């Protein structure tokens, strides 16, 4: 789950690059992207490796940022409507990802095969999972509470 959150947050942070036109906003995007990657490395692998990677990223970003600022003329930084809309939609997506119920979902997809096998006599994976069915469509996981309607629709389509 943490890998999925990292990917969504990195995609949302780096999508701001498309509308960032000034070096200050580009530097902030690079810095926040490196911070997200370093936190993920620190959580998944090692805190020491994450810290060293963070120091490397921050030093590189600071040198690049200061170089670009010395070349680029100073301008007033203003938020435009596109920027506000993208940031608010990214925050909303992150909030929705945090609210998802992962109790009946496995990333490996084995529960999906169990759902399709219920009509063939395969035992459900979880004790009370006969009420739930999972369908994975283009990376979005849907949990259906009415298993009989889901099974009937699958049997009629095949």
From Swiss-Prot:
Question: Could you name the Gene Ontology cellular component terms for this entry?
Answer: mitochondrial membrane
Q: What class of enzyme is it?
A: translocase
How does the record say this protein sits in the membrane? Multi-pass membrane protein
Q: Which UniProt keywords apply?
A: Electron transport, Membrane, Mitochondrion, NAD, Respiratory chain, Translocase, Transmembrane, Transmembrane helix, Transport, Ubiquinone
User: Which E.C. number(s) belong to this protein?
Assistant: 7.1.1.2
Q: Where does the chain cross the membrane?
A: 1-21, 48-68, 79-99
- What is this enzyme's catalytic activity, as reactions? a ubiquinone + NADH + 5 H(+)(in) = a ubiquinol + NAD(+) + 4 H(+)(out)
Subcellular localization(s) per the UniProt record: Mitochondrion membrane
Recorded GO molecular functions are: NADH dehydrogenase (ubiquinone) activity
* Disulphides: none
Q: What does this protein do?
A: Core subunit of the mitochondrial membrane respiratory chain NADH dehydrogenase (Complex I) that is believed to belong to the minimal assembly required for catalysis. Complex I functions in the transfer of electrons from NADH to the respiratory chain. The immediate electron acceptor for the enzyme is believed to be ubiquinone.
Task: Give the protein family.
Answer: Belongs to the complex I subunit 6 family.
**Name under which the protein is recorded:** NADH-ubiquinone oxidoreductase chain 6
What's the source species for this entry? Mytilus edulis (Blue mussel)
- Encoded by which gene? ND6
